[in-house]
UniProtKB/Swiss-Prot annotation:
PANTHER family: 4-DIPHOSPHOCYTIDYL-2-C-METHYL-D-ERYTHRITOL KINASE, CHLOROPLASTIC (PTHR43527:SF2). This is 4-diphosphocytidyl-2-C-methyl-D-erythritol kinase. Belongs to the GHMP kinase family. IspE subfamily. Keywords: ATP-binding, Isoprene biosynthesis, Kinase, Nucleotide-binding, Transferase. The keyword Plastid does not apply. Its EC number is 2.7.1.148. GO terms for molecular function: 4-(cytidine 5'-diphospho)-2-C-methyl-D-erythritol kinase activity; ATP binding. It catalyses: 4-CDP-2-C-methyl-D-erythritol + ATP = 4-CDP-2-C-methyl-D-erythritol 2-phosphate + ADP + H(+). Catalyzes the phosphorylation of the position 2 hydroxy group of 4-diphosphocytidyl-2C-methyl-D-erythritol. It comes from Corynebacterium efficiens (strain DSM 44549 / YS-314 / AJ 12310 / JCM 11189 / NBRC 100395). GO terms for biological process: isopentenyl diphosphate biosynthetic process, methylerythritol 4-phosphate pathway; terpenoid biosynthetic process. Residues 292-315 are annotated as: Disordered. The active site is at K10, D148. It is an enzyme of class 2 (transferase).
Length: 315
């Protein structure tokens, strides 16, 4: 059997960061939206090899950028093991071994949840293979895997609280166009949060202006309320990113912000053509490692706005 699943990347339109909690995480208030950059996972069962215990994953391969782990610490691999573990709690029947392949369409280490999208797509694939587990179980496992995985599982436009894993739908009337500038050098998320704490930065926990802008639906309204509490910390660690922001504004972007904990710079544009023009201008200037035009939220039927099954083939 071969099962293919897909999940989208994300952008944080608002990221409010509260103080660190006892568990080491920060309290977040964030507004997620899917972007039309996707990860595609293919799970292939090896019917002639049955596994009674331990990981069912025999191999993980990747098409796309270098630097993606192909070992058991990969989030997609962990997602498969986690859901198989849930099944073994009530059914110890041996399962076929599997091979995983990831076709990456989201830049690596860019703050757009590529790894979390891999995990979400893997959860959907395993659910189609040996499920159904139910949405509650899938979301529970997703939250155990990472703070962004539940959103990547559901997609759309969501208000996230807690670590970002507690999700509520938000109404969004607009379609937004971006040029996403990927940096050639990564930025450690723990380092950014540590710098945030060190700088004693204020927290933006009120999403009322963002909610109103999303109801308005215009790019101009959204440009006025984009907020990321981690931006000063990220820019302190990587001052060169300010040059990217300025280059984007010169090229015609309406607004600019650090995406998540960085280092990707998100440039909000008037429309799809403007996003392409800004991306072309920045690529001509040699700004960043790559520049990706993107749209948010992902259009289409509700069932495809989050992680979803693309195809199931029986060999």
């Amino acid at each position: 059997m071969r099962i293919t699943a897909r999940a989208w990347g994300k952008i944080n339109l608002h990221l409010g960061v509260g103080p660190a909690r006892e568990d080491g995480y920060h309290e977040l208030v964030t507004v997620f939206q899917t972007i039309d950059l996707a990860e595609t996972i293919t799970l292939t069962t090896l019917e002639d090899e049955l596994v009674e215990e331990g990981s069912v994953v025999r191999q993980l391969t990747v098409t796309g950028p270098r630097g993606v782990p192909t070992t058991p610490d990969n989030l997609a691999w962990r997602a498969v093991d986690a859901l198989v573990g849930r099944r073994r709690e009530h059914d110890r029947t041996p399962l076929p071994a599997v091979e995983l392949h990831i076709d990456k369409g989201i830049p690596v280490a860019g703050g757009m949840a590529g790894g979390s999208a891999d995990a979400a797509a893997a959860l959907r694939a395993v659910d189609a293979w040996i499920g159904p587990f139910g949405e509650e179980t899938l979301l529970e496992v997703a939250a155990e895997l990472g703070s962004d995985v539940p959103f990547c599982l559901l997609g759309g436009t969501k208000l996230g609280t807690g670590r970002g894993e507690q999700l509520v739908d938000m109404l969004s009337r607009g379609t937004y166009h971006w040029a996403l500038v990927v940096s050639p050098k990564g930025l450690s998320t723990p380092e950014v949060f540590a710098k945030f704490d060190e700088m004693s930065l204020p927290s933006s926990m009120d999403v009322t202006p963002m909610s109103q802008a999303l109801l308005d639906g215009s790019a101009g309204a959204l440009a006025e309320v984009l907020e990321n509490d981690l931006a000063p910390a990220a820019l302190s660690l990587r001052p060169d990113l300010r040059k990217t922001q300025l280059a984007g504004l010169r090229a015609g972007a309406l607004a600019t912000m650090v995406s998540g904990s960085g280092p990707t710079i998100a440039l909000l544009c008037d429309d799809a053509q403007s996003a392409r023009d800004v991306a072309d201008a920045l690529m001509d200037e040699g700004v960043g490692l790559s520049v990706h035009p993107a749209t948010s939220p992902v259009p289409g039927p509700a069932k495809n706005r989050g992680a979803h099954i693309v195809s199931i083939e029986s060999e």
